């Protein structure tokens, strides 16, 4: 539950941070990745060994 809380805080921080035009593409990519991580965490994917392996780039390599 704490992990989900941290992910939500991270996503909120990424979304609400001010940006300039040069970094808009990078921010969009970060927002998308944060959204994917939150979606996986909420689904319990990162705690499921099979799903974790399939999405190790989102869940982290270690288990």
From Swiss-Prot:
Organism: Conus stercusmuscarum (Fly-specked cone)
Key word Signal present: yes
Modified residues annotated as Cysteine amide in this record: 59
Pro-piece positions: 17-43
Disulfide pairings: 45-51, 46-59
Designated name of the protein: Alpha-conotoxin-like Sm1.3
Role of this protein: Alpha-conotoxins act on postsynaptic membranes, they bind to the nicotinic acetylcholine receptors (nAChR) and thus inhibit them.
One GO cellular component term noted in the UniProt record for this chain: host cell postsynaptic membrane
Keywords carried by this UniProt record: Acetylcholine receptor inhibiting toxin, Amidation, Disulfide bond, Neurotoxin, Oxidation, Postsynaptic neurotoxin, Secreted, Signal, Toxin
Subcellular location: Secreted
A Pfam family reported for this protein in Swiss-Prot or TrEMBL: Toxin_8
Positions bearing Methionine sulfoxide: 58
Domain of life of the organism encoding this protein: Eukaryota
Tissue expression per record: Expressed by the venom duct.
InterPro entries noted in UniProt: Conotoxin_a-typ
GO molecular function terms attached to this record: acetylcholine receptor inhibitor activity; toxin activity
Signal peptide location: 1-16
Domain notes: The cysteine framework is I (CC-C-C). Alpha3/5 pattern.
Similarity comment text for this entry: Belongs to the conotoxin A superfamily.
Main location, first listed in the record: secreted
